[in-house]
Amino acid sequence: NSVPKYLDMIEYTIVVVNNGPDKSFNVTVGDLLPDGVKFISSTGQYNPDTGVWFVGDLDANESATLKIVVQVIRVGNITNNVNVTGTGHDSNLTNNNDSVSVNVPESVLLNITKVANSTIIVAGENVGYTVTVTNYGPSVATNVVLKDIFNSKELLNLQYSLNGVDWLDYDEAINLGNINAGADVTVYFRAKVNGSVRGDVLNTVNITTSVDDARGNFSDNETVNVIANTTLVVIKDAEIKELNPGDTVHFIVTVIAGGSSDSLNVNLNDILDAKLLDVAGATYAVNGVNKGSWTGSIDLGNMLTGTAVTVDIWAKILDTADRDIFNSVNVTSDEHPDGNNS
């Protein structure tokens, strides 16, 4: 493996040849492994602590082979030197030494985690996330870029901070620059949860680096469960409370949405008394806009917290009406299925 990466395995092959003409005795090879590799295994009588491989005697033109398997544990240039000695006259000492070098490219082991400040969040309130990017080395992680992937309809006004004090609006990506080996960077996020959101909200972060040999966990996500905190107030009044048969009664209904969250699927139900009122001829308006005939109920849809809707209902009192008119309105929503009355 002449182009190993960090933590790869290398197999060194050492061949000793007696070129003759005489027999060589007590042949010994010295190969003390360099820093940057870790001994895994070998063939032959090799001692990794001393670097000595005792070959013994070699006849003329006889050879012996040693294989050493190591693991790369650092980056950069790693050179392995070897030499051989033996008893007897050696007419050529220039070939008793050899070396081989490998160049291990820069490498990083990165990890990113994302944790929410709470796994249960109320719609309409703020959620916070803490993102930690760690470089376990061995090299510097250069040009680290962090991206937060979120649904802009669920999380509003997303901001980030590198110190928890100074906040900036998030815009597509954050350039974290270089992260040294053994160091980490913490990024804080905060956003307002849309008041109309319910259920799980998934948020994902990922990182990239310009280091070619990058490993580890480059992405993480966090899911929070969004619940509602809503109130519905309904107020009903009559414009004139003293009326006669044949007059038109004007009911005024005001619906107010409160709480931290928006009220979803608000429905107003007002059944007029057909024995006292001309139900078929009743009309209504919403926030001052005439809507036509009143059929007994209306879907107000989603109401933002802090907003109000006014519904006016007009109906003629029948000529046969002979008693007081009692009228009740009920307003329901997803969070208040039983409704509130007035």
Predicted segments — roles?
Residues N1-S342:
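Exported/extracytosolic protein signature
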